[in-house]
């Protein structure tokens, strides 16, 4: 379980539920993302929640948690998602009439970016209503994430990026990303300063940016524009990439496995009215977890294709992992891979590598099975448990319901490629959030 890597030091693979629980919960304060992780991410993600530790992380999590409440779901989130689902439907309807082959994953990224920007920043970036507009931000952000991911296996990346093509493209991508966040923050700051306290009602709708702009430290200081921009980009990774990737993998499994597709279609059909019309397309937040066919397929998708397939922590002090685990020395890196754990028969049984949504359904009650957050670790665990897991789950259930109630989709021929026992596999690129 231990390795030594140049530039990184001693690395311990802790891809076991009991060891991950120790690192992420039992002895949480001893394991941090660390300065090296922060240094590799700083030029893009700054001091945001994705890269931070300690008090800085606690503050951001506390503020962000205030948007993920039941009242926010009912007042803001469900309506936004429904509106964007209708725009997705309109686009697919156009493609269907024209007989056009389209990129479903690209559409999912437009959907999650649009809905998250509306929820978090109250802005419509028109990615769905004007889909032919160049997605300069998305392309730049994707490239930046790819480079950030590569840095983990390139100890001399700082020197190399000064002179190579990757560094030149990275600087150009970073400039585009910074302009995107600058526009959001500066426009809101000007509006807030102009309106004064009138812009901060005690009641009424507040988005994530409102909450962070309203934050004051113990000495009364507000967050700087740079801190707000860091916050935006970190939340963007969580709100755009992870859900779009899960939707893509889920749809791929549905369209390549007739039994999965049929089960979801049966569930959809039972919830539509007699004419199969709009009344059955909108799912209330209070009951979305009753859609067990879609929810279990989503969970099985996340199990085999976790949004964060690998992660690390650095030990601040000496320690010993439980249940006969190795000794940990100060400075050691803990590596865990949810992707590898999902395929481990000691954790998930002899059928670990199979795509089986049924493992998430209780045969007697028909309800969803709850696994330990350190076994089903795709939403993280302990104090860093994903704040947006309910948002992502609702978003996926609602959009899949909306699309497949109206359309029969087919994959285009993927060619003869093989991987990991599958006859055909989709193309994808590495990033911080993609396996």
Swiss-Prot record:
PROSITE patterns: CYTOCHROME_P450 (PS00086). Disruption phenotype: Results in complete loss of ustilagic acid production. Induction: Expression is strongly induced under conditions of nitrogen starvation. Expression is positively regulated by the cluster-specific transcription factor rua1 that recognizes and binds to the specific 5'-T/G-G/T-C-G-C-A-T-A/T-C/T-C/T-G/A-3' upstream activating sequence found in all promoters of the UA biosynthesis genes. Its EC number is 1.-.-.-. GO terms for molecular function: heme binding; iron ion binding; monooxygenase activity; oxidoreductase activity, acting on paired donors, with incorporation or reduction of molecular oxygen. Pathway: Secondary metabolite biosynthesis. Its cofactor is heme. GO terms for biological process: lipid metabolic process. It comes from the Eukaryota. Keywords: Heme, Iron, Metal-binding, Monooxygenase, Oxidoreductase. Heme binds at residue 386. Cytochrome P450 monooxygenase; part of the gene cluster that mediates the biosynthesis of the glycolipid biosurfactant ustilagic acid (UA). UA is a secreted cellobiose glycolipid that is toxic for many microorganisms and confers biocontrol activity to U.maydis. UA consists of 15,16-dihydroxypalmitic or 2,15,16-trihydroxypalmitic acid, which is O-glycosidically linked to cellobiose at its terminal hydroxyl group. In addition, the cellobiose moiety is acetylated and acylated with a short-chain hydroxy fatty acid. Belongs to the cytochrome P450 family. This is Cytochrome P450 monooxygenase cyp1. It comes from Mycosarcoma maydis.
